[in-house]
């Protein structure tokens, strides 16, 4: 009932739900949980998000692979389709784009198994994530893609408070300024913690777990 709905400036088919409260991500404490579940799981909404992101990313010379973080594979598949509709080139011999998801090891580093490595090594990659609050996950993901021999061409996120990371513009459908009052803090500086207000939930790119 406390949920607030915010629509994208580019499309009235694309909306995120924000729930006010006290939430913890792996890197920060935030005063809104940004729920983009429907954008990731409903086909028509995912397709529209992909269309908006494709417009925002603009022209990319080569796209071979889209690396999907936080359960964004459905959006990633439609984003690949958007690129293939245009005059984008690919170095893939089969002339179609890979859509892959990494595993994360115990140190939260990207892990691509041997059967997936060929879709990264020497390939032109677009990194797609769901929600970016500090940019640390994007930073680690860029490091991982580089480690496996991929060349990142663009970075996209459905929601991001970060405009740039490691020299890449973060192309996002929603930014912090689209959510009036949204704030992220370090755990040490969190005003809720200082007042002794308990956490409502722990959140990550996949969703939330109430405490």
List each model region and its residues.
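Active-site-facing substrate-recognition patch
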Residues: 1-62, 205-211
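Conserved acidic residues
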Residues: 63-64, 123, 153
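PRPP-dependent phosphoribosyltransferase catalytic core
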Residues: 1-9, 142-211
């Amino acid at each position: 009932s406390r949920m607030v709905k915010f629509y994208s400036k580019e499309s009235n088919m694309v909306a995120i739900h924000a729930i006010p409260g006290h939430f913890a991500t792996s890197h920060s404490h935030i005063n809104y949980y940004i729920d983009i579940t429907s954008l990731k799981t409903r086909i028509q909404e995912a397709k529209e998000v992909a269309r908006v992101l494709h417009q925002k990313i603009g022209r990319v010379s080569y796209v071979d692979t889209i690396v999907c973080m936080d359960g964004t594979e459905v959006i990633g598949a439609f984003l690949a389709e958007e690129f293939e509709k245009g005059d984008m080139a690919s170095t893939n011999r089969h002339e179609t784009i890979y859509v892959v998801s990494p595993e994360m090891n115990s140190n939260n580093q990207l892990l691509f198994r041997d059967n997936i490595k060929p879709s990264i090594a020497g390939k032109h990659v677009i990194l797609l994530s769901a929600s970016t609050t500090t940019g640390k996950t994007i930073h680690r993901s860029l490091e991982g893609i580089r480690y496996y021999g991929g060349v990142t061409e663009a970075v996209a996120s459905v929601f991001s408070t970060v405009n740039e990371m490691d020299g890449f513009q973060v192309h996002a459908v929603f930014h912090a300024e689209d959510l009036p009052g949204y704030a992220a803090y370090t755990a040490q500086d969190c005003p809720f913690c200082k007042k002794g207000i308990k956490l409502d939930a722990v959140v990550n790119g996949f969703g939330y777990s109430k405490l």
